[in-house]
């Protein structure tokens, strides 16, 4: 049968399409190179963003584009799913992608953006250490490395993030309080220290920048993983160093500290993040009944 030859290279003269044709084409890696330092501060979060965007560029096979359409977005999400990414992980990666594309759009590098829809995240069970588990795990850490033991104590009693603790300087510890400056949300916070957290920072300064500056994340995680296997927690994926932050939060909530103060202690930007621990406050509604009982 007759099939017409379709000329896809028609030139439209509307102002809109003229504008489109003037837009240069960029790959995602090029856009990241252009804007990453403007959009994200230095730190571990920026490092993660860099690898997220690198992975997405690789999924897109480094193609250059002047508009990012829904189909491209769907193919990225589909590929991340095939790679075993959970919805929560996909949302983190999409947040980075959308922030970069919005900036590129604002600067006139990309003329169209897809609609980003958050994937539904399951409220994952928050695993924390019971005192007995902490004791066994910390003893195994200590038998391998005294510095890592001190750091473990500090993490579980201050609830700070691993990077925040390793980045501490001596100046950040004043009169039984510690100030975290290098935080994920770029807001400093100051928390008082428990006796054993204080003790964990009391070592000879020598040439060290801070109490845990002789350690790095890779080395600490290695020691942690060996200790974890030794005490029979090897198959529990959730027993990572970050569990110490969850453990601190859950102890505060179970001890009757109100959720707003727990938020301030942990340095969460939104209360919603802290609400993940709220259900642990088993008896915090009992006082409501007292108020309502007719005297």
Describe the residue ranges of each PLM region.
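N-terminal DNA-binding module of tyrosine recombinases/phage integrases
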Residues: 1-71
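Catalytic-site neighborhood detector that most strongly recognizes the C-terminal catalytic loop/helix
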Residues: 26, 128, 182-186, 196, ...
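N-terminal DNA-binding recognition helix of tyrosine site-specific recombinases/integrases
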Residues: 55, 63-78, 82-116, 159-163, ...
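DNA breakage-rejoining catalytic core of tyrosine-based enzymes
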Residues: 66, 108-111, 121-139, 185-195, ...
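Active-site/catalytic core of tyrosine-dependent DNA strand-transfer enzymes
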Residues: 194-236
């Amino acid at each position: 049968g007759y099939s017409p030859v379709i000329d896809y290279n028609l030139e439209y003269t509307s102002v809109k399409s003229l504008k489109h044709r003037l837009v240069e084409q960029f790959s995602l890696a090029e856009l990241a190179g252009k804007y990453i330092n403007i959009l994200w501060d230095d730190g571990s979060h920026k490092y993660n963003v860099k690898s997220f965007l690198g992975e997405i560029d690789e999924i897109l096979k480094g193609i250059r584009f002047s508009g990012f359409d829904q189909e491209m977005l769907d193919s990225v999400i589909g590929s991340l799913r095939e790679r075993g990414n959970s919805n929560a992980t996909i949302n983190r990666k999409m947040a980075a992608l959308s922030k970069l594309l919005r900036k590129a759009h604002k600067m006139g590098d990309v003329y169209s953006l897809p609609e980003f829809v958050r994937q539904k995240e399951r409220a994952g069970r928050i695993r924390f250490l019971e005192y007995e588990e902490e004791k066994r795990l910390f003893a195994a850490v200590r038998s391998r490395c005294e510095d890592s033991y001190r750091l473990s104590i500090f993490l579980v009693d201050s609830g700070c993030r691993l990077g925040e603790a390793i980045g501490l300087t001596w100046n950040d510890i004043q009169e039984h309080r510690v100030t975290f400056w290098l935080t994920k949300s770029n807001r400093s916070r100051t928390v008082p220290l428990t006796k054993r957290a204080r003790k964990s920072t009391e070592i000879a300064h020598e040439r060290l920048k801070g109490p845990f500056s002789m350690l790095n994340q890779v080395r600490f995680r290695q020691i942690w993983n060996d200790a974890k296997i030794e005490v029979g927690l090897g198959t529990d994926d959730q027993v990572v160093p970050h569990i110490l932050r969850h453990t601190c939060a859950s102890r505060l909530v179970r001890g009757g500290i109100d959720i707003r103060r727990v938020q301030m202690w942990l340095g969460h930007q939104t209360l919603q993040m802290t609400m993940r621990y709220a259900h642990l406050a088993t008896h915090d509604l009992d006082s409501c009944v007292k108020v309502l009982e007719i005297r």
